[in-house]
């Protein structure tokens, strides 16, 4: 179930201010954020946003297909190293 249309999409105020400031200055430097729950808006297209994954900031280049998704979807928090192979002999 999605968010109510009456409320509009969630985006952190600090992130919104940084994106608007860069759009006004026509600057495309990396924006660092911890807000994984923020929705990607059309004004963010072309920006590189470094999203925190719990350990480091993962750079995410925003494209047109990402609009409407959350920033956290593009910065995985878990690393899967594969299942352990069974030993040959067994019991």
Swiss-Prot record:
GO terms for molecular function: rRNA binding; structural constituent of ribosome. Gene3D superfamilies: 30s Ribosomal Protein S19, Chain A. SUPFAM superfamilies: Ribosomal protein S19. Transmembrane segments: none annotated. GO terms for cellular component: cytoplasm; small ribosomal subunit. PANTHER family: RIBOSOMAL PROTEIN S19P FAMILY MEMBER, SMALL RIBOSOMAL SUBUNIT PROTEIN US19M. This is Small ribosomal subunit protein uS19. It comes from Synechococcus sp. (strain CC9311). The lineage of its organism: Bacteria, Bacillati, Cyanobacteriota, Cyanophyceae, Synechococcales.
